[in-house]
Every structure is written in structure tokens, then in C-alpha cells.
Design a protein with these regions (language model features):
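Mid/C-terminal beta-alpha module of Rossmann-like enzyme folds, strongest
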Residues: 51-116, 133, 149, 153-156, ...
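Active-site loop of classical SDR/Rossmann-like NAD(P)-dependent oxidoreductases
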Residues: 117-133
Length: 169
């Protein structure tokens, strides 16, 4: 199973880290967030994984797994901005993001600490690729149970319960 960007409860890279960056005002979109985000809600990934374990023909096969759609990063991270009650997320051009990434990569060589942002991250966040999950649909019977809207609603509930967002009154 090769999952897209896994979001939902306990996902550090695609849930916890973005909400922390948005809450602190440090989140920045690249090129206005028009790159494509391929995503999968954690429960959808679990469904696909369990389905693969039940089929002998899946042994040795590669299955791309996502929620079956891609959205621009500005929409994906926009859900988190709404949850955090932040009106918008700032943007920087790709060339600037790459320069910043290079600077952080060089600095990390001297500090021994991993860079917080890299040129590869800048490329990733501006990519226009889409996951094709037809093989998983056909061979595993995979069908995402949760849409992005449903997954984000459940994620918001978890973020509030876990203390990453204030509890609603």
C-alpha cells in the first residue's frame, strides 16, 4: 500500500503540524497554494490495508491509496484555517520558498538539526500530480468511506478533544 498524504487523528505531518503552524501564524502557502494535494483519511487507509490483507492476489502488488480526488493545498489547509478561526494563510512565490529551503538546508549542516523546510518540500507543495487509485478500486474493492469534508469534520473533533484547538462551547 502506498498512501497519499495521510490526515486525521494522530497524523503529525498532515494534521498536527499544519494546525500548529496555522495557530502560530507560521503557515505559508507556496504559489497561493495551487499545487495539488493527494490525501487519504486515516480510516480510508485502514480500510484499504485490511482489504489487501484479505486478498491473496494482493501479495507483492503495489496499490496507490487516496480518497480518490486531489484538491489544491489552499483548500486542504483552508479546512485547518477555518477550524482555527484564521481568516487566511499567507503565500510566498515558489522561487522564494526554494531560496529559503536552500538556506535552511545549509544551516542544518552546521547545526546538525534537520531543516524545517527544504527545496524538495517546495517542489512537493507545487506539484500537479494526481494519484490513480483504479487498481485498488478494481483489485481490492477499495471505495473511500469518508469524503474530505467528512474526514475533516472528524479530524476537527479529534483536534478539539486532543487540545490542539479550543473546545467549542
Amino acid at each position: 500500500i502506498r498512501p497519499a498524504n495521510v490526515y486525521g487523528p494522530c497524523s503529525n505531518p498532515w494534521t498536527i503540524r499544519p494546525i500548529k503552524l496555522i495557530n502560530s501564524g507560521q503557515m505559508i502557502l507556496i504559489n497561493k497554494g495551487i499545487g495539488l494535494c493527494n490525501y487519504v483519511y486515516i480510516d480510508n487507509l485502514i480500510d484499504a490495508t485490511l482489504s489487501a490483507t484479505k486478498r491473496d492476489q494482493s501479495v507483492g502488488q503495489v496499490y496507490l491509496v487516496s480518497d480518490g480526488a486531489a484538491v489544491m493545498w489552499k483548500e486542504f489547509f483552508g479546512y485547518y484555517a477555518q477550524m482555527a478561526r484564521k481568516p487566511s494563510i499567507r503565500s510566498a512565490p515558489q522561487w522564494l520558498a526554494k531560496v529559503i529551503g536552500l538556506g535552511m538546508e545549509i544551516t542544518s549542516r552546521f547545526t546538525g538539526k534537520p531543516p524545517k523546510f527544504t527545496r524538495e518540500a517546495a517542489r512537493f507543495l507545487t506539484c500537479q500530480a494526481r494519484f490513480n487509485i483504479e487498481k485498488a478500486r478494481h483489485e481490492l474493492g477499495y471505495q473511500p468511506r469518508f469524503s474530505l469534508q467528512e474526514g475533516m469534520k472528524l479530524t476537527e473533533q479529534w483536534l478539539r478533544e486532543a487540545g490542539y484547538l479550543p473546545k467549542e462551547k
